[in-house]
C-alpha cells in the first residue's frame, strides 16, 4: 500500500500545468525557493558534485535549482502529471543533471539504501497519511554522514490562522483546501521521528512572510513554517 492520499495526488495533478508559472498557485514555492536552496547549500558547504534526492519533487522547482548548482539530482513523486511537467521543463531548460521517477520514497529506500549525499523533502510530509514513514525512508536513503532537509508547517492556533485562514481564504495565495490542519506537524513530532531513524538534528529555522511586501525570510520563529537540517549518524 502506497503512503499517499489519492485526494492529495489528484489536487496537485489538476494544477500540474501551472507548476512553472510564478504568478500561479505555486507562486509561494517560487518565492521561497532561493531561500531554501541557499540554506541547504550553506549547510552542506556546496552542492556541486553531490548526489541529491528530492522526495516529493512536484514540478521540479527545487530539483532543477539544485541541479543548476552542480548536483546530480533525482526527483521522485507519485503525481504522474507533475513529473511530466518537471521532465518537460528540464528538457526545455537543457538541464541534464536532473532525472525524475514515479516511485514512493519507501520503495526507493529498499532499492537504493544509503545512496545519496543529500536528501530533501520540502513542503511534502504534511500531505501524506504516514509522515513518519517518509522520514524513515529519507534516513535510509542518505549515506552515513549525509544530510536530510525537511520542511513543513507547525500545528497550533497561529499556524491555522496564518497558513489556512490567511493564506487560503483571505490572501488567496493558495487554493482553499490545499492544507489540512490535522496533518500539520509539530517540531517535537518531526524531531522524534528523525531521532528514531538515526538522524541527528543540526539546525532548525522558521520561515516568515510579510503580505504587504510579499517577502519571505528565514528566522528563529518556527511557529508556522519551519525547516530542519539533520545529519545521518555514522556507524
Swiss-Prot record:
Example GO molecular function: 2-polyprenyl-6-hydroxyphenol methylase activity
One matching Pfam family: Methyltransf_23
Residues annotated for S-adenosyl-L-methionine binding in this entry: 36, 56, 77, 122
Catalytic function, reaction form: a 3-demethylubiquinol + S-adenosyl-L-methionine = a ubiquinol + S-adenosyl-L-homocysteine + H(+); a 3-(all-trans-polyprenyl)benzene-1,2-diol + S-adenosyl-L-methionine = a 2-methoxy-6-(all-trans-polyprenyl)phenol + S-adenosyl-L-homocysteine + H(+)
Keyword check for Ribosomal protein: no
Enzyme class of the recorded protein, top EC level: transferase
GO biological process assignments: methylation
EC number(s) recorded for this UniProt protein: 2.1.1.222, 2.1.1.64
Domain of life: Bacteria
This protein's pathway: Cofactor biosynthesis; ubiquinone biosynthesis
InterPro entries: SAM-dependent_MTases_sf, UbiG_MeTrfase
SUPFAM superfamilies membership: S-adenosyl-L-methionine-dependent methyltransferases
Sorted UniProt keywords: Methyltransferase, S-adenosyl-L-methionine, Transferase, Ubiquinone biosynthesis
NCBIfam families: UbiG
Role noted for this protein: O-methyltransferase that catalyzes the 2 O-methylation steps in the ubiquinone biosynthetic pathway.
HAMAP family associated with the record: UbiG
Protein's name in the database: Ubiquinone biosynthesis O-methyltransferase
Species assigned in the record: Leptothrix cholodnii (strain ATCC 51168 / LMG 8142 / SP-6)
Lineage: Bacteria, Pseudomonadati, Pseudomonadota, Betaproteobacteria, Burkholderiales
